[in-house]
Amino acid sequence: MSLTKTERTIIVSMWAKISTQADTIGTETLERLFLSHPQTKTYFPHFDLHPGSAQLRAHGSKVVAAVGDAVKSIDDIGGALSKLSELHAYILRVDPVNFKLLSHCLLVTLAARFPADFTAEAHAAWDKFLSVVSSVLTEKYR
């Protein structure tokens, strides 16, 4: 699945706004994930998962930074996230379905934080982009 030029433009232009709030968005996305899908907490037994904890904020920053890497390398997302894919497949052994759950939580967070920018067209573009990211992150599982 490849992104159209219009979709890429939407992703890159929204990223300029998102990146200014990256840490907050990452934290909020993870809080949403753990609240909506508590089974995902099993991958973080050593974390303080209370809302706003330092560990939650730090990991949220990493998650959004990885999305930023994908945006910056939108024409080579596979290359940008290859090491992250290997980490999650071979070392952390994260169930691939969790990437879709996380993507959904990020979409909800973006819609809540950027209601004027998150049009139906933007929603579709971000959904497709995050599907590509999820696919890249799970390709090492095969």
Swiss-Prot record:
InterPro entries assigned: Globin (IPR000971), Globin-like_sf (IPR009050), Globin/Proto (IPR012292), Hemoglobin_a-typ (IPR002338), Hemoglobin_oxygen_transport (IPR050056), Hemoglobin_zeta (IPR002340)
Residue positions where Phosphothreonine is found in the record: 29
Tissues in which the protein is found: Detected in fetal erythrocytes (at protein level).
Presence of keyword Phosphoprotein: yes
A Pfam match: Globin
GO cellular component, one term: extracellular exosome
Function recorded in the entry: The zeta chain is an alpha-type chain of mammalian embryonic hemoglobin.
Subunit (UniProt): Heterotetramer of two zeta chains and two epsilon chains in early embryonic hemoglobin Gower-1; two zeta chains and two gamma chains in fetal hemoglobin Portland-1. Heterotetramer of two zeta chains and two beta chains in hemoglobin Portland-2, detected in fetuses and neonates with homozygous alpha-thalassemia.
Protein name as annotated: Hemoglobin subunit zeta
Lineage of the species this protein comes from: Eukaryota, Metazoa, Chordata, Craniata, Vertebrata
